[in-house]
UniProtKB/Swiss-Prot annotation:
Keywords: Leucine-rich repeat, Repeat. It comes from the Eukaryota. Residues 155-177 have a biased composition (Acidic residues). The keyword Cell inner membrane does not apply. LRR repeats lie at residues 19-40, 42-63, 64-85, 90-110. Belongs to the ANP32 family. Residues 155-229 are annotated as: Disordered. The keyword RNA-binding does not apply. It comes from Caenorhabditis elegans. Residues 219-229 have a biased composition (Basic and acidic residues). This is Acidic leucine-rich nuclear phosphoprotein 32-related protein 1.
Amino acid sequence: MPSMAEIYVKELRERDPATVDTLFLDNAEDGQIGGLTDQLINLEMLSMVKCGLTTLAGFPTLPALTYLDISDNQLGDNASFDVLVKNAPDLKKITLASNKLSLDNLRCLKVLPNLFELDLSNNPSLGLLEDYREKMFEMIPSLKILDGCDVDGEEVEEEFAGEGGEDSEEGSGDEDGPGLSYLEKSQFSDDETDDYAPEGGDAEPRGTKRGASDNGEEPDNKKAAGDDE
């Protein structure tokens, strides 16, 4: 497999780095960040999945970056997340699934003012932590979605197509939603979202919040609405 620097050159395709808004540098074999420059001033989405990363040392200055996917790496005590606070201050979503993270490794992320969503699934130490979700939401005040569920534990479905994707209109009903520009690159048809209803009854539109469990129990807000009627 090629190094990250080699993948970067290939992905760049002789484009001006300042014009690039999305980069996929997955499966680099050298286990370190390399090749990226501070010229990527308009980069909004960066993926470095399965690169064997143990640290984010060498992370470039990316002022427009809103979504970072660094899942399936070896990030842990030496992750150096403070570099994200300094070099990517506008981050709204970070995917950190399948790493080796602890709560202490993530404390510096609370300084990111717009951090809206984190995916920390499949981090063994976090999975064993008592009251893990409560502690994360308390530690990062701006956080609204953790591991695909909101602060109330209700699942938030997100739809992505290709390199970006767009949440359905109903799914983005929260006024304080992330509004990531990379989500605007493709659209789902109305048949797949708002107008979908299977035979035999009403269906919940895709892209809306639903209970994280499938036990059939109605959320409290729906029960309250029924009582009012």
